């Protein structure tokens, strides 16, 4: 039995680019980055420990869902802001976090 494949018709796979179709880009890292910054500011200004911890969580999600080709400066600044919110909230009040309800 002969090989039915035609070598002249074989084409190499090229993944679709996000420049041609912006709907393929996932907005989750950007949203989590923004949420992380908002929660870390609330944690710093209002001294809410649970806001600071949610900011750290959002920063981790943003980092985990980001692409390697993206600029990491904004992500790292958001992460450092959330860590500083946790540190500052525990430096001002070292007691364990009380439930928000």
UniProtKB/Swiss-Prot annotation:
Family to which the UniProt record says this protein belongs: Belongs to the Asterix family.
Biological process terms in GO annotation: multi-pass transmembrane protein insertion into ER membrane; protein insertion into ER membrane
Single GO cellular component term: endoplasmic reticulum membrane
Transmembrane segments: 28-46, 48-65, 70-90
Pfam family of the protein (one): ASTER
GO terms for MF: protein folding chaperone
Protein name as it appears in the record: PAT complex subunit Asterix
Location(s), subcellular: Endoplasmic reticulum membrane
Lumenal side: 47, 91-101
Region Disordered, annotated ranges: 1-26
Membrane topology: Multi-pass membrane protein
Main location, first listed in the record: endoplasmic reticulum
Induction: Up-regulated by FGF.
Assembly information from the UniProt record: Component of the multi-pass translocon (MPT) complex.
Function: Component of the multi-pass translocon (MPT) complex that mediates insertion of multi-pass membrane proteins into the lipid bilayer of membranes. The MPT complex takes over after the SEC61 complex: following membrane insertion of the first few transmembrane segments of proteins by the SEC61 complex, the MPT complex occludes the lateral gate of the SEC61 complex to promote insertion of subsequent transmembrane regions.
Residues on Cytoplasmic side: 1-27, 66-69
